[in-house]
A protein has these predicted regions:
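Outer-membrane beta-barrel proteins
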Residues: 1-311
C-alpha cells in the first residue's frame, strides 16, 4: 500500500511539473472624477449633491496557447466587492462571459440605446414610471456573443437563475455598417418566468445613422408584465449629437414614457455637452421632466456637471 501511495504521489508531482502557467498582465485602475447634481423639484423643493469616483479595478489578461484570450475583472466600489467578471474570447467562435454583479451586456442591453449623447444617457435623468429595459440581470449572469464573419452582424444571449425560479433570458441581434454609418438592432427578454403570473417580457428596437459630424438615433422599448396588477410601459427615445471639433461635442435628446393607466405621458428633454482638454474631461447636461410619474403639473429640472482625469 505504501508503494502504491508513493507511485501515486510521484505521478501527481510529475503532472504538476508538466503543467505550464499562462503568462498574464495585471492592470490596476482607479478613477479620478468629481461631479455635481442639482434638482429643482415640485415634489421636494430641490436637492443637490457632490459625488466622487470611489472604485478600484483589477484586470488580469492572458493569451492561451491556442490564441484565445482569458480575462478576469474585479471591481472594488465604495470599499466593497461590486463587480466580478470572467471573459473567454475564443476568436471566431465568439466570446463567453460569466459575471457576478456584472452583466455581459450581450442580450437586450446591447440594443436598448442607440441614441447619441455628449454626456449621460437621457434615461438617467428620469423615466420614473419604469427603469429602462435591463435584460437578464447581473447576478450569476452567463452570456455569449458571436460576430458572424465579416457581415457586420452580431448575435448575443445571456441568462441568469431567477430568484422566483426558472431562468431569465435575454437575446439580441445587431447590424453595423461602418462605411455607411448605419447601425440597427433588436432584442427581447423573458424575465422571471416562474413568478406566478407568467413572467415579464421586454422588447427593444433601435437604429442610428452617422453623417459627418452629426449622429442621430432612436429607440422604441416595451415592458409587458404578466401580472395584471402591474401596468405595461412603452419608451420612445430619440436624439442627435454634433461633434463641433475633436474636443467639443453637444447633443439634444427627447424621451417619452407611457404607462397603461397613467393620465399623461412622462417626457424628458435633455441638452448635454462634453469637452476634453488633454487628460482632463468635462461633461454636463440640463434635463427637464414633465408630468413625472404620469401626473400633470409635476415637473423636475436636473442639472449635472462632472470633471474627470485620465491616468
Amino acid at each position: 500500500m505504501n508503494k502504491l501511495k508513493k507511485i501515486g504521489l510521484t505521478a501527481l508531482a510529475g503532472s504538476m511539473v508538466a503543467t505550464a502557467a499562462t503568462a498574464a498582465d495585471v492592470t490596476v485602475g482607479a478613477s479620478w472624477s468629481l461631479s455635481y447634481t442639482g434638482q429643482d423639484s415640485d415634489e421636494n423643493g430641490g436637492a443637490a449633491s457632490w459625488t466622487m469616483g470611489d472604485s478600484v479595478t483589477f484586470t488580469t489578461t492572458g493569451e492561451l496557447d491556442n490564441g484565445w484570450t482569458a480575462t478576469a475583472y474585479y471591481e472594488l466600489d465604495d470599499d466593497e466587492m461590486d463587480d466580478q467578471k470572467l471573459t473567454l474570447n475564443m476568436g471566431d467562435m465568439g466570446t463567453v462571459v460569466f459575471g457576478d454583479g456584472a452583466a455581459g451586456g450581450f442580450g437586450i442591453d446591447n440594443v436598448k440605446n442607440f441614441v447619441p449623447t455628449a454626456d449621460s444617457p437621457i434615461f438617467s435623468v428620469g423615466l420614473t414610471m419604469l427603469a429602462y429595459t435591463g435584460g437578464a440581470g447581473t447576478t450569476g449572469n452567463l452570456a455569449y456573443k458571436l460576430a458572424v464573419g465579416d457581415t457586420g452582424v452580431t448575435v448575443g444571449a445571456e441568462q441568469e437563475v431567477d430568484a422566483a425560479g426558472g431562468y431569465s433570458r435575454s437575446m439580441s441581434i445587431k447590424y453595423d455598417n461602418a462605411d455607411a454609418g448605419f447601425s440597427f438592432g433588436l432584442g427581447t427578454s423573458e424575465l422571471a418566468p416562474d413568478n406566478g403570473s407568467g413572467g415579464n417580457t421586454e422588447t427593444a428596437v433601435g437604429a442610428s445613422y452617422t453623417m459627418g459630424a452629426f449622429k442621430i438615433g432612436g429607440n422604441h422599448n416595451e415592458t409587458d408584465y404578466g401580472s395584471t396588477a402591474t401596468n405595461d410601459v412603452d419608451n420612445q427615445h430619440y436624439g442627435v449629437s454634433y461633434a463641433v471639433n475633436d474636443d467639443l461635442t453637444i447633443s439634444y435628446g427627447v424621451g417619452n414614457n407611457s404607462k397603461d393607466t397613467a393620465a399623461n405621458d412622462e417626457e424628458v428633454v435633455q441638452m448635454a455637452a462634453s469637452y476634453s482638454m488633454g487628460s482632463i474631461s468635462f461633461g454636463g447636461y440640463i434635463g427637464k421632466q414633465s408630468s413625472v410619474g404620469g401626473t400633470a403639473g409635476d415637473d423636475d429640472i436636473t442639472k449635472h456637471i462632472s470633471m474627470s482625469v485620465a491616468f
